[in-house]
Amino acid sequence: MLQPPTLTPNANGEEFRGSVSTDRSSASPSNIDEIMEDDVNQKDEDEDLNLVDRVSKLETNFVFIQHQLSSIMNHLHAPQCKCTTCSKVNQPGAEEQKNDTSVLSQLFPNASDQQLKTLLDLSKMNKLPSQVVHKDQQNGSSFLPSANKTSENPKPIELKPLKLGQGYQMANGGGGGKIHTERLSEPARKQSRKVGFPPPVASYYQRKESSNPLVPPTPLSSIPNLITNSNAVSANTSTASPGPSSEGSGDDHLEAPNEVAHMHSSTVPATPTTPGANLFTQSMVDMLKLNAQNAAHSTGSPGFLRGRGRGRPKLIGDELDADLVDYMVSLKNSDPHGGHFTASQALHMARQYILERAPGLLEEHGGHVKLKLTWAMKLVSRIGERQREIELGLPAGTLSNMGRNLTNIPAGGNFMADMMAQNIFSQHMMMVNQQLEGGSPPASSSSTATTSTATKTVKQESKNGHQNEENLNVKQEASTMPEIINIKELNLPFLNNFLAELNDNNSGLIDGEIGAAGPSMAALFAPNA
């Protein structure tokens, strides 16, 4: 609140009214102009600072917007404006986006900064410094890496940086250095799989070289010496194998040198008894041992096979299979209960037997034989067939060579059929022996009487000494033992009469199989009847 002016009397006793002085010279300071100038300057400086900050902020924002728009346009593949103003404004952003790192980042979006840097170094050089080789001028035939040559030559090779992709076009041989680093090629491979492109050619050839079986991964010192042991191998195989026969094929024996070339670690140390065994696997050694013991394995000759003169050999070999069948028959006969082997039981026992005899044949020990349940089922049928042959006193393989007419008869299940088969063979063998010896069998039937008269005639002619060439030929033909293939080929009169009687009685004669008859028939045709 303003105070009222005070009135002071003058010397004349008059009072003066209060008034405000208008003289600025005494009231205002002397440097009023300087003060005003400083005030104006201070305001200008504040305005300048505010403008600088605002411009810098605007510049930063515009640069950000420019970069974002450039990135969006590059991703959308949108063409830029061709006017002068836009070209001047967009030129810095375009140059920024066209640098090498940005191009590589667009090509490999999943690559890290270190990978992009390595790719950039590769693109600016012909090859990596460790891969750069040059020809020695002194000897002209030695190629050494540049890393080793830098220590010998005082002037190392200077590699000038090139533009992106220039080294691949200017490399010697028409192609650039291949990138074999899996760490670098994995992002590109993933991206190519997403797009659907085929894999790179360099990676394809790299996998092809690494998986080539002709290139051994082991050094030469670990490969067995095939030249020094070739004589021992040839001597061993020559004694064990007489050579392929006309019936068999020798292709299986020609595969052994090829298998020897691919041997790595599954070799067997050589022993004095088996020379050259270090060049073969355990399965091959077992097969060579079997060939040395049995010539039928190498020749395929029917004369050495036990009742198997045709078709392909058994899975484990004919001889080993026959021994296995005999072993299983002995186990079956030793069972007091007379039990029957199932396929699984036979498979287990056969596996144990093969492990004892020739373990190298099985697949779990490096062999080629894989025992299956179907093979065991066939083994059970062969065991039953061999058991019937032993009960009938027949050699091995007789029933299989005679056909499948008698194989359906269960062993011990049809007494009449077993007795008939045994009686027929015993009667026939007795008559043949009597013809050879010149004796006369007891006249039990018309057939025996006929054979006795024939033998008496031959004996009388021999006593009188009036034999001629025709009689000699007849005697030789009578002494020749025919090959029995089926029962019906015997053509015996008493057998024909018996079969006719069975047909009259409706006993059922089906394809050579004789039906069950009563005990009177069994007693009639018993061996001691």
From Swiss-Prot:
The keyword DNA-binding applies. Residues 233-248, 443-455 have a biased composition (Low complexity). Keywords: DNA-binding. Residues 1-39, 131-158, 173-200, 233-255, 436-476 are annotated as: Disordered. It comes from the Eukaryota. Residues 19-31, 138-153 have a biased composition (Polar residues). GO terms for molecular function: DNA binding. Residues 179-189, 458-469 have a biased composition (Basic and acidic residues). Transmembrane segments: none annotated. Residues 307-319 bind DNA. The keyword NADP does not apply. This is AT hook-containing protein attf-4. It comes from Caenorhabditis elegans.
